[in-house]
């Protein structure tokens, strides 16, 4: 996270110390990168700009396709169950590289869940999809299983029951309109399920390499406070994570 890095750099500067930062990429990513809803642009140019702005001791790490494959089995063992394949194996590799010189790091994980950065917070079709927005269909998962076996699992019923039970836990405010209520539910689902998955992934992966990854944006008090901030403040002017951006004025380059 650029904001986390900036705050840390400022504190270390008071002590005459230089912040050490890392960024990660995939080999030849500049040749094959395709913009998407989760990552509209490449990170590397912004990481370089931020490192220069903070005058941090910055290290670029790259992961090849072969390395991703080599770390797959170890990644599964770190999770004790099948996981997110190449995404997790590359994270394991990067954590291992960082662990050679550091034992504790701060990450920017969870900012999108807490401050509403994902597409499902902004697209009406995803707000009211009636299921977990990051998994609108089970077809890709069911395709991995024998059809008869998949049918006995009744996966759709399981997901629907889990979704209905989760949204019933959300406290609805009487002054909110239908759209605001939908965003409140989406926010709860993102924190209750999506964020928990990422936190577990980060914890298991980093600790497997002897690295402790701390997540400032997952601070309980911060999450509780931001959850109840009105959406028109969180995304003022339609700008994604606007309130977080405003809090960073003067701390980040324009």
What are these regions (language model features)?
Residues 1-175, 182-186, 201-251:
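ATP-dependent adenylate-handling active sites, centered on carboxylate activation for C-N bond formation
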Residues 190-198:
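Core structural elements
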């Amino acid at each position: 996270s650029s904001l986390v890095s900036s705050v840390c750099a400022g504190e270390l500067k008071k002590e005459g110390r230089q912040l050490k930062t890392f960024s990660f990429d995939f080999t030849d990513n500049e040749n094959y990168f395709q913009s998407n809803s989760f990552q509209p642009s490449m990170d590397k140019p912004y990481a370089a700009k931020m490192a220069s702005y903070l005058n941090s001791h910055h290290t670029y790490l790259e992961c090849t396709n072969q390395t991703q494959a080599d770390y797959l089995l170890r990644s599964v063992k770190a999770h004790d169950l099948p996981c997110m394949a190449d995404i997790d194996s590359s994270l394991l590799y990067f954590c291992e590289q960082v662990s050679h010189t550091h034992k504790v790091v701060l990450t920017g994980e969870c900012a999108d869940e807490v401050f509403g950065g994902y597409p499902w917070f902004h697209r009406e079709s995803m707000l009211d999809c009636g299921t977990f927005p990051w998994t609108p269909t089970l077809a890709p998962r069911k395709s991995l299983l024998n059809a008869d076996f998949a049918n006995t699992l009744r996966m759709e019923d399981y997901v629907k029951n889990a979704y209905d039970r989760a949204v019933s836990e959300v406290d609805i405010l009487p002054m909110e309109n239908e759209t605001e209520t939908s965003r409140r539910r989406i926010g709860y689902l993102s924190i209750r399920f999506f964020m928990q998955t990422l936190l577990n992934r980060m914890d298991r992966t980093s600790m497997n390499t002897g690295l402790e990854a701390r997540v400032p944006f997952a601070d309980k008090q911060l999450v509780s406070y931001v959850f109840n901030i009105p959406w028109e403040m969180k995304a003022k002017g339609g700008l994604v994570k606007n309130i977080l951006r405003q809090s960073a004025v003067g701390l980040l380059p324009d």
